[in-house]
């Protein structure tokens, strides 16, 4: 007979491992209990659960890998709420830095260059890195000095102390590029 649900049951048990064990779900026979006043003692699991029930709180397994496992007498609902709140705050504080690319050709007009420069500044103010790329086609490859000149003029304009040149002007194949990044704010 083939058990078709075995994979689903296995997945359910894995997701349950992320939750902390509380009260009768704690498997150890003896646990180190941390009381509300900070005192500790090693007790059989039944006595520890009884102590938690006496003060109308939960026995929560904090460190299951310790010998004996460490449990704390706390209100599990409040504890879980504070953990989720802390994780939400950490996610909010994380900033994902994206790499934005601004492309141009070596025969770019001054007005177009001004427009591209405004885009570059906007991306940098948002906190993104900017890759400025110049594509050369055909005979333009003989005049790479024009590309270096354009990149230098952009760097002079950006020259603010809030931005840093992460990668100097390089030539790869038919493209020339440099990367400008905002300084990290710590």
UniProtKB/Swiss-Prot annotation:
Residues 1-20 are annotated as: Disordered. The keyword Membrane does not apply. Pfam families: IF3_C, IF3_N. GO terms for molecular function: ribosome binding; translation initiation factor activity. Its main location: cytoplasm. GO terms for cellular component: cytosol; membrane. It is found in: Cytoplasm. It comes from the Bacteria. Keywords: Cytoplasm, Initiation factor, Protein biosynthesis. GO terms for biological process: ribosome disassembly. InterPro entries: T_IF-3_C_sf, T_IF-3_N_sf, Translation_initiation_fac3_CS, Translation_initiation_fac_3, Translation_initiation_fac_3_C, Translation_initiation_fac_3_N. Belongs to the IF-3 family. NCBIfam families: infC (TIGR00168). PANTHER family: TRANSLATION INITIATION FACTOR IF-3, TRANSLATION INITIATION FACTOR IF-3, MITOCHONDRIAL. HAMAP family: IF_3. Monomer. IF-3 binds to the 30S ribosomal subunit and shifts the equilibrium between 70S ribosomes and their 50S and 30S subunits in favor of the free subunits, thus enhancing the availability of 30S subunits on which protein synthesis initiation begins. This is Translation initiation factor IF-3. It comes from Borrelia duttonii (strain Ly). The gene is infC.
